[in-house]
Amino acid sequence: MTSDLRVSLPGLELKNPIMPASGCFGFGQEYGRYYDLNLLGAFIIKAATKEPRLGNATPRVAETPSGMLNAIGLQNPGIEAIMAEKLPWLAERYPDLPIIANVAGNTEADYVAVCERISQAPNVHAIELNISCPNVAHGGLEFGTSPEAAATLTKACVAVSQVPVYVKLSPNVTDIRPIAKAVEAAGAAGFSLINTLVGMRIDPKTRQPILANQTGGLSGLAIKPVAIRLVHQVRSISNLPIIGMGGVATAGDALELMAAGANAIAVGTANFSEPFACPNIIKALPDELAKYDLHDFKTFAVNQEVL
């Protein structure tokens, strides 16, 4: 029997559940040299902010066991350049590829302006509201660690967006569930999780942090158990769709996160060590499903009641 990998989410009709995570795939121009991006279920583009950002000082990447730390600082060319150059480039070459726009900012007004503008792009099918970036001085975690602030921002962005808004939740909180409940009540169409965990590395020679920003976001295989736990927790209190991410490098990793409650999967750090990570996972999914006598994702979900 042929496997059916299709997944239907608000604003997104996916041929398969696999997509590159924001910040790990740029705007697709580099990876598009290596394979046809039409193979992907969707594509979460690099964060868009109101003004161009150069990002943090270097060094801003450090290796860790089974992962990496990054403190890029949301470097991007700004919303107007993205609207004028990046999104048209994708639309011309991949007209049927659903694009999810990651949106960030310093203030509520910044987020609202970018959401309103980028949701007008014909190939943007959904927004990923980035309220959980740990590597910027303002915005990000200021919104993502408070249920009230997260709800206020979500409501404002949903009000102006022409496409569904998925809220990217932070793992750097004591309890993720009140924040998930708050943004659901504020109108979120779904969640994406997890963002990176705050970490640090020290150079024993200098006794100083390796990253110029001192701290960075930990990603890669090391965070997979945390991602599984938090996806499972959010699924326990909500029926909204979840785009799960954190430590996914194989089809088995993807299914484990889907068993925890994710409906689709974003692949991040794995793209750096294996540029073909996403198509490799997509190709392996039918055989991985067949191990459990399954041929689609309709019955592949965590067995728990939503409270």
From Swiss-Prot:
One Pfam family it belongs to: DHO_dh
Subcellular location as annotated: Cytoplasm
Residue numbers annotated as active site: C133
Free-text comment on the cofactor: Binds 1 FMN per subunit.
TM annotation in the entry: none
Binding site for substrate: K46, N70, A71, I72, G73, L74, N130, N195, T196
Alphabetically ordered keywords of this record: Cytoplasm, Flavoprotein, FMN, NAD, Oxidoreductase, Pyrimidine biosynthesis
EC primary class: oxidoreductase
Pathway stated in the Swiss-Prot or TrEMBL entry: Pyrimidine metabolism; UMP biosynthesis via de novo pathway; orotate from (S)-dihydroorotate (NAD(+) route): step 1/1
Keyword Hydrolase assigned: no
Family: Belongs to the dihydroorotate dehydrogenase family. Type 1 subfamily.
Primary role: Catalyzes the conversion of dihydroorotate to orotate with NAD(+) as electron acceptor.
NCBIfam families in alphabetical order: PRK07259.1 (NF005574), pyrD_sub1_fam (TIGR01037)
Name of the featured protein: Dihydroorotate dehydrogenase B (NAD(+)), catalytic subunit
